[in-house]
């Protein structure tokens, strides 16, 4: 099932991201329309009418002209397009940033989420917390994202990687429990909806 949009917006509010948050969007996200403003969004790889597929986080740091693209699976652009028919290059072209000269694309390249986990939206909230607090280094070398350990995407199904990714999800829940009143109030339901093996559970129903 994963995270509903209203859940993500409530957690974003608790994490202090709201002043910079454009909202939750489906794959038709129009891009960053104000090139001089620190801003971020959570974007689904599918159209809203399909019920959604996978959440990504996008962020814009104008001081360094950095466009951050956070995918909890760390998929390549080719794989995102292959699996979800989603490509960030088209999104960049739609954005006001496209005509602003050189834009630095900074992309997550490692997997932090288990292959059958439905917690992608929650990982995006965690990343955006890092972004609004450390916009020059939101991917690594900050107290939020350093709670997680990335593994190469090609190794995500290995038993040794699964143990690391399961611990990442535990750290994610612990982080949200510390920082989000909404998460604490609704924790049992959120953990059921986003569990580490949620996709397997759905397949076996």
From Swiss-Prot:
InterPro entries: Papain-like_cys_pep_sf, Peptidase_C5. GO terms for cellular component: host cell nucleus; virion component. It comes from the Viruses. This is Protease. Requires DNA and protease cofactor for maximal activation. Inside nascent virions, becomes partially activated by binding to the viral DNA, allowing it to cleave the cofactor that binds to the protease and fully activates it. Actin, like the viral protease cofactor, seems to act as a cofactor in the cleavage of cytokeratin 18 and of actin itself. Transmembrane segments: none annotated. It comes from Bovine adenovirus 2. All late proteins expressed from the major late promoter are produced by alternative splicing and alternative polyadenylation of the same gene giving rise to non-overlapping ORFs. A leader sequence is present in the N-terminus of all these mRNAs and is recognized by the viral shutoff protein to provide expression although conventional translation via ribosome scanning from the cap has been shut off in the host cell. It is an enzyme of class 3 (hydrolase). Interacts with protease cofactor pVI-C; this interaction is necessary for protease activation. The record marks 51-52 as: Cleavage.
């Amino acid at each position: 099932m994963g995270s509903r949009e209203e859940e993500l917006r409530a957690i974003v509010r608790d994490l202090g991201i709201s002043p910079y948050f454009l909202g939750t969007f489906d794959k038709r996200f129009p891009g960053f329309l104000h090139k001089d403003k620190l801003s971020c969004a959570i974007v689904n790889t599918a159209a809203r009418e399909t019920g959604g597929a996978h959440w990504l986080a996008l962020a814009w740091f104008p001081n360094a002209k950095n466009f951050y693209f956070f995918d909890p699976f760390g998929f390549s652009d080719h794989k995102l397009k292959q699996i979800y028919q989603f490509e960030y290059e088209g999104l960049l072209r739609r954005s006001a940033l496209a005509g602003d000269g050189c834009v630095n694309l900074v992309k997550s390249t490692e997997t932090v989420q288990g292959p059958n986990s439905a917690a992608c939206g929650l990982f995006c909230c965690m990343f955006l917390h890092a972004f609004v607090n450390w916009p020059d280094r939101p991917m690594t070398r900050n107290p939020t994202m350093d709670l997680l350990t990335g593994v190469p995407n090609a190794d995500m199904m290995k038993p040794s990687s699964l143990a690391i990714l399961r611990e990442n999800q535990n750290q994610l829940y612990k982080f949200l429990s510390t920082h989000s009143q909404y998460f604490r109030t609704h924790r049992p339901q959120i953990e059921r909806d986003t569990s580490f093996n949620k996709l397997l559970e759905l397949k076996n129903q």
